[in-house]
A protein has these predicted regions:
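Active-site-proximal specificity loops/subdomain of glycosyltransferases
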Residues: 38-80
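Short, acidic, metal-binding catalytic loop of nucleotide-sugar glycosyltransferases
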Residues: 21-30
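The conserved acidic donor/metal-binding loop of glycosyltransferases
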Residues: 90-94
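Short beta-strand/turn micro-motifs composed of small residues
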Residues: 6-8, 37-39, 213
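Catalytic core and acceptor-binding pocket of nucleotide-sugar-dependent glycosyltransferases
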Residues: 134-214
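Conserved donor-nucleotide/metal-binding helix-loop-beta segment in metal-dependent transferases, i.e.
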Residues: 95-129
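Short aromatic/hydrophobic "clamp" motif used to bind/position activated sugar donors
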Residues: 86
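N-proximal low-complexity "stem/linker" segments adjacent to membrane-targeting elements
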Residues: 1-18
Length: 217
């Protein structure tokens, strides 16, 4: 089973409406949709977000740098999801193709794209912070496109091995949750994913239009 996981906040709620409409129209094969928002934004959510979809809504006591906090929440999405797989969707993802998302997992392996850092342009900015997280050199960038699907087990294992993950993220100054997840899985859970180097990968049209919201979801 696959749960759809969205971390959002008040500035992205209008965009979230369109995201949810596109999920309702185009996506099948998921177990549930989980949305996590700051507690302080709950009333705004109630007034802005309108959907016929059954949503499992969680509110959290957000603090400090919201951009970093939302990344910690994504790193610990297993706390809110029950399924074997978690599909990350941001509020500014608008799906435009019909798909059963079960087809995105082949033989128990979701696809994760990666590109050598020498070829990623401005995304080189994520290299140093990911290396700090890994405590090792990282050669590849893993935040190639959304949606991304990860094993729930991967997230839970990372948190178990790094019980101070919240402090690590919140005090990092700069962090990239999807690069951290990708780099860790590439080393420790490689057999659980289909890692595809974009040098050898045959281009496939993305499932969604990725818009630019407010740099934190």
């Amino acid at each position: 089973m696959i749960d759809i996981f969205i971390k959002s906040y008040y500035k992205d709620f209008k965009m979230l409406n369109y995201c949810l409409k596109s999920i309702e129209k185009y996506l099948t094969g998921y177990n549930k949709i989980v949305i996590v928002i700051p507690k302080k934004d709950y009333q705004i959510y109630q007034s802005i977000v309108h959907t016929e979809l059954p949503i499992e809504l969680h509110v959290v006591e957000e603090y400090g740098d919201g951009y970093l906090y939302q990344q910690f929440i994504k790193m610990t999405a297993y706390k809110y999801c029950d399924s074997q797989f978690i599909m990350y969707v941001d509020s500014d993802c608008i799906f435009d193709k019909h798909i059963n998302i079960q087809s995105l997992v082949s033989n128990g392996q979701p696809e994760i794209l990666y590109t050598h850092y020498s070829k990623v342009g401005d995304a080189i900015c994520w290299k140093q912070c990911t290396e700090r997280f890994m405590n090792d050199t990282v050669h590849f960038e893993f935040m190639r496109r959304l949606p991304l699907i990860y094993h729930r087990e991967t997230l839970e294992t990372i948190h178990n091995l790094e019980p101070n993950l919240e402090s690590l993220v919140m005090n990092s100054g700069r962090f990239s949750e999807f690069n951290a997840l990708g780099a860790w899985a590439f080393v420790h859970h490689k057999d659980k994913y289909r890692f595809e180097n974009t040098d050898n990968w045959q281009y496939v049209e993305p499932l969604n239009i990725q818009l630019w919201s407010h740099c934190r979801n």
